[in-house]
């Protein structure tokens, strides 16, 4: 039920402050890629290997690069992408690959590593199991997802110590700012200083920052005493 307010004043608006540990769009490094280019995901993952990231959590324990690939909505294509990536020997050797969609969880670990994952396992418990078994040896994790990688889902381990560090956003350039912001699962509350990086197109980057600025202006306007 909605209550109609004939005259809204600034005193009736409660502004909620973001937690100090919150990382938003302004805290993310954006790297331009051609999201239409064939093989751009594989190319980006190989470049990440060359960067030799070394991350540590708040307890100074190793934290892997965890990449979310927000790509095709068609579930069979997500499995095809995982298999295609796994056929690359460098990726097969270094990356743990996860598909997370409405059909469940599908996992391929680097060579000579095994894990027992139930099909209906949550992404959080899956990350936790990998952490418990292979924290010292698995340095790269890629999660391929579609519609499930939207607002309301946090890609973190159950103990909250592992979280996303990178994202490839291959959304349509015609996507609205609202949708793109909901796709941006890198945003969140993290109790460490691990840098966050988004790989996407120039158009999507501009749209995200434009929408973020619009939100800021709306908040400032609502807090303006002249509203009265």
Descriptions of predicted regions:
Residues 2-8, 81-87, 158-165, 182-187, ...:
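Short secondary-structure boundary/capping segments
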Residues 206-228:
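Long, hydrophobic alpha-helical segments
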Residues 148, 182-186, 202-203:
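Catalytic cores of nucleophile-dependent amide-cleaving enzymes
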Residues 195-204:
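Long, low-complexity intrinsically disordered regions enriched in Ser/Thr/Pro/Gly
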Residues 19-150, 160, 173-180:
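Conserved C-terminal RecA-like helicase domain
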Residues 153:
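Conserved phosphate/anionic-ligand binding catalytic regions in large, soluble enzymes, centered on
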